[in-house]
Each structure stands twice: as structure tokens, then as C-alpha cells.
Amino acid sequence: MKLFVFLALFGAAFAQRNGFCRLPAEPGICRAFMPRYYFDVEKGQCEQFIYGGCKGNENNFETLKECQDACGEPERASDFEKADFETGCKAAPETGLCKASFERWFFNAASGECEEFIYGGCGGNDNNYENKEECEFACKY
């Protein structure tokens, strides 16, 4: 009986904990400009969005790791793609035309290392990676 109660409570807590991961990204009604992460059910991974600072829903995380810990596994190297070296690794980083402030990674061909830069959210070029691991997989190895 105790095992049944434990399993029932554990199952309910697990379902409740992950239920919010199915909610869509909700920027809220305010006009702040806060890069956040949400779990995209269709893509099966955490994605970045802009949060306005109030309202919204529980599918809203300050870091990629928080989102992955709550809703899904981190990406594996096998999920990444190799880049065309000329367009995806040699190009200088481009902020793009929009005014967002996303932390991204680019491959610095001169140093042979992946480095952070600020991406505006649209435009830019292919030398633009969501994390260091993706950049290194695409350009370094």
C-alpha cells in the first residue's frame, strides 16, 4: 500500500512538474526585453525567446540549463551538424539587423577558438551558434 501511494504521488508530481513544458512561449504583457528559454514541444528542445518581464507562464527559464533540467535533455554532439567552413566558420560575426541581445557563439578562424558575441535576433550569417559545443562541433573538429 505504501508503495502504491508513493508511486501515485511520484507520478502526479512528475506529470505536474513537466506539464508546463507543453505550454507555448508566452512573452507576457510588459515591454521589457529579457532573453529567456522555453521548451518547444514540436522541436523537442529548449529555444530562446524574448520575455516582456511580467505575466507569461511557467515555461520560462533564465538559462538554457534550467530549461533542459526541467523539460528535456541537453543536445548531444550527434545532434549538431558540420558547417560549411567558408560560410559557417570563416565569416566574421554579424549582430544582424534586429535589436535583441542574445548571447551566441562564433568561430574565430584567426584564433581557432569559439568565442561569444551578441546577436540581435535576425539576419547575420551562418557563423552563429547557440552554444560553444555546437560551434566547436561545427568548426573545430
From Swiss-Prot:
PANTHER family to which the protein is assigned, alphabetical: BPTI_KUNITZ INHIBITOR DOMAIN-CONTAINING PROTEIN, KUNITZ-TYPE PROTEASE INHIBITOR-RELATED
GO MF entries: serine-type endopeptidase inhibitor activity; toxin activity
GO terms (BP aspect): envenomation resulting in negative regulation of voltage-gated potassium channel activity in another organism
Pfam families for this protein: Kunitz_BPTI
Any one GO cellular component localisation term in the record: extracellular space
Location in the cell: Secreted
Signal peptide boundaries: 1-15
Cystine pairings recorded for this chain: C21-C71, C30-C54, C46-C67, C89-C139, C98-C122, C114-C135
Entries under PROSITE patterns matching the protein: BPTI_KUNITZ_1, BPTI_KUNITZ_2
Name of the protein this chain belongs to: Thrombin inhibitor hemalin
InterPro entries xref list: Kunitz_BPTI, Kunitz_BPTI_sf, Prtase_inh_Kunz-CS, TFPI/VKTCI-like
Superkingdom of origin organism: Eukaryota
Chief place where the protein resides: secreted
Tissue expression remark: Expressed in the major tissues of the adult female tick, including the midgut (highest expression), salivary glands, ovaries, hemolymph, and fat bodies.
Domain BPTI/Kunitz inhibitor residues, every copy: 21-71, 89-139
Keyword annotations: Blood coagulation cascade inhibiting toxin, Cell adhesion impairing toxin, Disulfide bond, Hemostasis impairing toxin, Platelet aggregation inhibiting toxin, Protease inhibitor, Repeat, Secreted, Serine protease inhibitor, Signal, Toxin
Changes seen on gene knockout: After gene silencing by RNA interference, the tick attachment time is prolonged and about 25% of RNA-treated ticks do not successfully complete the blood feeding and detach from the host. No significant difference is observed in the engorgement body, egg weight, and hatching capability of eggs.
Function: Anticoagulant protein that may inhibit thrombin by binding to its exosite I. The recombinant protein delays plasma clotting time and inhibits both thrombin-induced fibrinogen clotting and thrombin-induced platelet aggregation in a dose-dependent manner. May be an anticoagulant for the common pathway of blood coagulation.
